[in-house]
Each structure stands twice: as structure tokens, then as C-alpha cells.
Amino acid sequence: MESKNVIAAIALSTAVIVLYSLFFLPEQKSNNQNIADNAKVEQSSDAPSLEQKETLVSISRDEALTQSERIQFENNNIIGSISLKGASIDDLTFKKYKVSLDKEDRVTLLGPRNIKEGYLIESGFVTSDKNVDVPNSKTVWLVEGNNKLTNESPIKLSWTNNQGLKFEKEISLDDEYLFTVKQKIINKTNNKYDFYSYGQIIRNEIPEIIDFLILHEGLIATLDDELIEEDYDDIQENKFTKIAKKGFLGISDKYWITSLIPPKSTEFKTTFDYKNKFRANFITTDPLELNGNSSIEEELKII
């Protein structure tokens, strides 16, 4: 009887050790990795913060679209426009999908930032040098060349600051849902600068949620082959941050997803946060060195 008790005690102790190693030791490793990642994050620049006090005006979507100059885009699947104020993609409608079977209205996904249903995508460069002006959400870009974006004709936007730096965006569109954005800075001075590229998806409010068990609606990413799914209410309470070398990030609905693919072969930090608006953001962690009388360029993709 005593030997049976000893065997049982050994078996129980072994089970406790195995369970501890399975469920607690990896968590400790993960915590250590998060501490290291967070330390690295603190050393890098950060993308522009959301305008927390921006007023959401009570106007219609159509009226909001008239408040800034725009450049149209269209292919066989989507139609919309890019605001020249901020160079944001904030107007997109699906040509082949109806709101309901008994109506002719098409599904609209994106909307201007200054309405309640605001949902948009923007990108650019930032620098830790506070004396250098960079384009922001209020910058008005100029159109060079083509004045309509199609799958056969890309567009180019430009803006020049007072320090002799010219910022360019070349935007192309395939015949499906893929935008490719080539961002470039041309330095016409002898000065040297460091820049970080970023992209972000901004959504003003939580859409109607289906809340189906196997369906994720919220902020989503695949970072270094790890799937990340964060609900809206989770992000309202806690910010998510992770450094990765490859992947995508975005916001998903029942039927639709809006996503960013950061530049290849560069490490980037992904952030999901909420500051009166939801944001899915990436920023490169290593600076691009812009030498005098030279240029730098990076490419990101939007789906």
C-alpha cells in the first residue's frame, strides 16, 4: 500500500513538472522577448499620432468628398478617389457587389476622415529631426502627369518643403484590388537626413459586428508567420505592438479586409491602438539614410 502511494506521488509530481514546463516556461520566454522588443521599440521613431481633437462634422459622405481636391481611380472592380489633402485613399466602392439583392446601391468600404464612418489609408515618411517639415494629413499634394488612376495609367503626386526636399508618391493599381505605392524623397541640398517610412489604416468607429464564433472582425496581422487577431474592444483597452521582418496588417470585416504590406527586406514595428480612432500602423525600425544630392525610395502595397 505504501509503495503504491509513493508511485502515485511520483506520478503526480512528474505531471506537475511537465505541465509547468509546458504552460509556464514558454510564457516566461515570451515575456522576456516582449521586454526586449519593447526596449527596441523605444529606441525607434514613431509614426504621426492621430489627431485626437479632430472634429467629426455632421455632413453627408458626398459633401465631405467635395471638401478637398481629388484624383479619381477606377478599374473593372473598384471605383473611388484619392484626396490630395493628405494623399489618403479614403473613397472606395465595389462595382460588382450590391448592398442587398433588391437594391442597386454598391458596397462602399472607405470614407473621408472627417465623417463618423471615416475609414482611410495613408502613408509617408517621418523623421526625428523636428526642424524638417514632412507631409502630413493636412498637406496638399500636386498632381504630375496623369489625372486619373487606372490599371493602365499610374499617377504621381509631389510636395516640396522649404528645406529643399521633394516628396513623391507614384501610385499604381492592378485590375483587382491592389494598390502599389512607391514613396520617394529627393534631396536637393548637401545636408544628410534620416527617415522612417510608415503606413496606417484609420477607422473612426466600430462597424456593425456579426460576432460569429469562427469569424474575426477587428484588427488583424500576420507577423513573421504568427497570426494576430485583436478585437476592437481589446484595442480600446490595451495597445498592441510587435516588431517583425515580414507580414501584413489590417482591419477585417465579415466580407472585406483592408490591409497594408510593408516594404520588403526591412524590419518594421506594427501597432494597433485607439485614440478616439482605431489605427493599424507600421513604421520601419531602421532609418533610411538620405545623403546630400541623392534620393531614397521604398515601396508598400495596399489591398
Where do the PLM segments sit?
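Juxtamembrane extramembrane loops of integral membrane proteins
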Residues: S13, F23-R106
